[in-house]
Amino acid sequence: MNSVDAKSALRNTLTQKQELVRDYQAVADQLNNNDVAKMYSHFAEAEAIHATQIKEKLEQLH
């Protein structure tokens, strides 16, 4: 089993989380159902929190 460099894993995951924030928010902005749009906005907020945590960890590792 190959080991994965922590910084590489964090950078890859950060990119994924940032894409999810954009995707969820784009869907929320386009939906005509306010309840579902709000749900997608919450998803975007949660992913943004994850992205911030990952960025902080990356800064600690540098």
Report residues per predicted region:
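Iron-associated oxidoreductase/ferritin-like identity signal
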Residues: 1-62
